[in-house]
């Protein structure tokens, strides 16, 4: 079966059509700047494979429906298409940010599921409305085709109350559902399953610390194959220092800044989400630019690098304590998979925990799951490339199979 995976943003649609018999993407792409005077569509045929072909188009897209119609035209094009017509698509899997406590696993989209997504718009004001728009577009363009929602928060629903509750008045949780939800769950779940396969260990016996490090960063403590804690909270702002997000700070800083800088709640939110993290410390949110600046003696870039890796190291220690026994520390996503400097610095000084990195292995980049720890290490340190689209497609099939 071919599964179309959709990740709908407020002004974008990211998509991938996957042949699930071979687990190979037939095409992928991104529609950008929806609603602006001029939009852009980047479409790849046979992505990440020999003979990959990239097509780029610039045209206005008034709304998500227009953008998705153009995608369907490309997928089924007589010359460049990868399928003959829409009937060769068996199901659609949607990435959805927040399903709250009501949705603990991937679900077939119906009125109830859409209602839950709407109910959590106050906690996911940017993503949930956009995700819902993507679902409604798919329902319009592919009538009768099953749509499945795969939620970023699913994997973390196994956390115990002691991990997900905040020490605020309990009435605020009961009334407003203020609690830790966690995000990047689709990636953490994929990495957990892939690590079990790679190590040849039963999933229900696997204890690992997963480190999803990209422009957004999160970690998870996984015990017996299930998440027991994660760094992101009620929003993706909590936890690690990120590209533009501050991560953990003293909450009293927020009202202090609002008073001293005369900031509105929205302005304070923008400061913490868009102007902080690596960008706030040194003006750069791309780790590659930061490394170049460090090499040229930029002290703020060096400090930002040290802060970034220090906070990851702290959470490794905390999650080691939570798990008691750790089979592996696993790095994934853009920085986690490709940045040997970050991995080396994070693991430096953790020998007493059985965590160490072999410099030669750490320098290898081959796109495959691999050890970067020395032979005989008590804890394996791994690089495992993530594949959220494949995980969404697999979850979609699992729901349809019942």
UniProtKB/Swiss-Prot annotation:
Its main location: cytoplasm. GO terms for cellular component: cytoplasm. It comes from the Bacteria. It catalyses: acetate + ATP = acetyl phosphate + ADP. Mg(2+) binds at residues 7, 388. CDD domains: ASKHA_NBD_AcK_PK. PROSITE patterns: ACETATE_KINASE_1, ACETATE_KINASE_2. Belongs to the acetokinase family. This is Acetate kinase.
């Amino acid at each position: 079966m071919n599964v179309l995976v959709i990740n709908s943003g407020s002004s974008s649609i990211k998509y991938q059509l996957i042949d699930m018999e071979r687990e190979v993407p037939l095409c992928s792409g991104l529609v950008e700047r929806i609603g602006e005077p001029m939009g852009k569509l980047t479409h790849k045929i046979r992505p990440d494979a020999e003979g990959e072909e990239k097509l780029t188009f610039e045209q206005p897209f008034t709304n998500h429906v227009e953008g998705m119609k153009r995608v369907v035209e490309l997928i089924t094009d007589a010359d460049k298409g990868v399928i003959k017509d829409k009937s060769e698509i068996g199901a659609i899997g949607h990435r959805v940010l927040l399903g709250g406590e009501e949705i603990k696993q991937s679900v077939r989209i119906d009125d109830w599921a859409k209602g839950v997504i709407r109910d959590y718009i106050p906690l996911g004001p940017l993503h949930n409305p956009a995700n819902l728009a993507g679902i409604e577009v798919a329902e319009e363009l592919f009538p009768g085709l099953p749509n499945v929602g795969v939620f970023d928060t699913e994997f973390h629903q196994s956390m115990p109350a002691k991990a997900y509750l905040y020490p605020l008045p309990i009435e605020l949780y009961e009334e407003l559902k203020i609690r830790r939800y966690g995000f990047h769950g689709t990636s953490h779940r994929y990495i957990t399953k892939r690590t079990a396969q790679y190590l040849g260990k039963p999933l229900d016996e696997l204890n690992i610390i997963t480190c999803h490090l990209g422009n957004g960063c999160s970690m998870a403590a996984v015990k017996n194959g299930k998440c027991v804690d994660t760094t992101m909270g009620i929003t993706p702002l909590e936890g690690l220092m990120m590209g533009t997000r501050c991560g953990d700070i003293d909450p009293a800083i927020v009202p202090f800044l609002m008073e001293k800088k005369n900031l509105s709640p929205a302005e304070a939110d923008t400061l913490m989400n868009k102007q902080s993290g690596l960008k706030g410390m040194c003006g750069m949110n791309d780790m590659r630019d930061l490394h170049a600046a460090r090499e040229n003696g930029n002290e703020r870039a060096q400090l930002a690098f040290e802060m970034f890796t220090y906070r990851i190291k702290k959470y490794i220690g905390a999650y080691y304590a939570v798990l008691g026994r750790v089979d592996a520390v696993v790095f994934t996503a853009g920085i986690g998979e490709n940045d040997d400097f970050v991995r080396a610095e994070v693991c430096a000084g953790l020998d007493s925990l059985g965590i160490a990195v072999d410099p030669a292995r750490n320098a290898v980049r081959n796109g495959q799951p691999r050890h970067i720890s020395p032979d005989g290490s008590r804890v394996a340190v791994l690089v495992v490339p993530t594949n959220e689209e494949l995980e969404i497609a697999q979850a979609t099939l699992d729901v349809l199979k019942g």
